[in-house]
């Protein structure tokens, strides 16, 4: 297989790290209760279950091309840390470590934990995989039902280009936490039960809100509660950059970067249910999948057109004028999952940070309907990570009865 040019999205993500501005490593953590597997057994399992993925054999070298290689070496790509630390400490350390050539930029780490538990951390360069790809790989690694495809917009009508371009207009404002991103990471998470999330979704008299609407409304409230929206929190201009999956309807397990981002205004209302109502109205009114697919088509049309204009557009998308923070969500729609005798208890998505944006928030729902809310910041904002994580859980609970 000959080398292939990176897609425009892959190349843009690759350029962030190649230019020396940021580490573009992201991760997905799977937490378990039970006996951890032997390292050799985990390596054998990964080599067997992921052997069919050509994407895991790709390396980038020093250019903007994917270079195929032999089947991945499980001894290199699957390991466990040698130093003693908690799973949380290992996770924060590992997602701050950049990948470099010549090997494919991904690794799976077995992280021993206290009280008979453990975690797996799948981390990768964002140019190679996106969050959905990481979830697919973890689902394939574990034992359990086949994952159900995510809900996607119908494909009867071709996507329109205009909504995607409209979404590029300025809509954000600088916030107190914006600024240069340092080289270390802080991670904090909190858990929301299925009952709490269901009660929050049923909080509006107008009808059931989506789980994502609850997540975004909770983020708006947590930012306000932490003082992260400035001295005048009622001002507009706080926007979430929301990745939307644009994979074909019949290929939800496709690896790589197959998403586009859509901005969702985060309301400044002082009351939790008013914030949820505002987000719910926006997400119902705006065709998010159609807009995302239109934007994906526009980005794909830039292939081979790198120049001053595309570089300026990339810098703008990274700026606080475009969006305030990343808010990404995933859902594991399969049934209970296990790794040998150990049961999966939760998943957490740990995104890479973009230039000038030292804060990102994610939600991952499991098959029971429970969710893990995760905050990733750079080291300088580590206090904000812990504060927002606690506030996110409080905001979801506040929406219930």
Placement of each model-derived feature along the sequence:
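Soluble acyl-CoA-dependent acyltransferase catalytic core bearing the H(X)4D motif
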Residues: 1-9, 29-51, 55-355, 364-368, ...
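Generic N-terminal amphipathic, Lys/Arg-enriched alpha-helix
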Residues: 23-29
């Amino acid at each position: 297989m000959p080398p292939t040019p990176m897609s425009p999205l892959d190349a843009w993500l690759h350029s962030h790290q190649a230019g020396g501005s940021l580490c573009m490593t992201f991760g997905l953590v799977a937490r378990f209760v039970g006996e951890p597997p032997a390292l050799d057994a985990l390596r054998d399992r990964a080599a067997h279950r992921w052997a069919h993925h050509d994407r895991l054999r790709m390396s980038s070298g020093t250019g903007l091309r994917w270079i195929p290689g032999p089947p991945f070496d499980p001894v290199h790509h699957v390991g466990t840390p040698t130093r003693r630390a908690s799973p949380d400490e290992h996770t924060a350390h590992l997602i701050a470590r950049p990948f470099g050539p010549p090997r494919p930029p991904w690794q799976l780490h077995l992280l021993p934990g206290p009280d008979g538990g453990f975690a797996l951390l799948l981390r990768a360069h964002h140019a190679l995989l996106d969050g959905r790809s990481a979830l697919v790989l973890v689902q394939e690694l574990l034992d359990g039902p086949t994952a159900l495809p995510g809900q996607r917009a119908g494909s009867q009508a071709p996507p329109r280009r205009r909504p995607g371009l409209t979404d590029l207009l300025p809509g954000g404002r600088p916030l107190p936490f914006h600024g240069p991103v340092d080289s270390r990471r802080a991670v904090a998470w909190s858990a929301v039960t299925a009952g709490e999330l269901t009660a929050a979704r049923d909080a509006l008299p107008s009808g059931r809100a989506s789980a994502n609407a609850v997540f975004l409304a909770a983020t708006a409230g947590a930012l306000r509660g932490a003082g992260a929206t400035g001295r005048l929190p009622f001002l507009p201009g706080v926007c979430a950059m929301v990745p939307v999956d644009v994979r074909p309807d019949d290929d939800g397990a496709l690896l790589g970067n197959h998403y586009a981002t859509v901005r969702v205004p985060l309301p400044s209302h002082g009351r939790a249910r008013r914030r949820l109502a505002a987000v719910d109205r926006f997400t119902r009114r705006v065709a998010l999948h159609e807009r995302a697919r239109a934007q994906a088509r526009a980005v794909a049309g830039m292939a081979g057109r790198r120049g001053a204009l595309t570089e300026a557009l990339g810098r703008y998308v990274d700026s606080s004028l475009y969006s305030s923070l990343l808010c990404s969500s995933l859902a594991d729609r399969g049934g209970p999952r296990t790794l040998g005798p150990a049961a999966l208890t939760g998943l957490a998505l740990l995104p890479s940070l973009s230039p000038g944006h030292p804060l990102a928030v994610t939600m991952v729902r499991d098959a029971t309907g429970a969710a893990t809310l995760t905050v990733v910041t750079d080291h300088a904002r580590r206090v904000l990570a812990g504060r927002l994580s606690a506030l996110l859980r409080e905001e979801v609970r506040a929406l219930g009865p």
